[in-house]
């Protein structure tokens, strides 16, 4: 934390992978004690490592969390949210996927292991947005 007491910032990215029928790739977060947004369906997302670009973060989400290659597209939107002890700044991007997403085994260093994958309408992300999911709020507000 900076010496002036201001909250430290963290950057993150999330992806909105859309099929031709308009459904968006959704992942279910673990329903475990201590997990943020337990059991909620949301967008695949990742906190960026120091020096990691948004595009690199999107590709990492594909490899580590979806077992598929992602290509970044246009920005859906950006958001900021105060969390416990830090400020989260997130970009949500459209992305295309090569192959079918799958739940890989826990990768070394991965912080969230999703428990399920599905394709849902954008309106389905409203619950997660209301429960505090920044990426889902950005998606729902953009109405893409």
Features from the language model and the residues they span:
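A generic structural signal for short hydrophobic patches within well-formed alpha-helices
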Residues: 48, 125-126
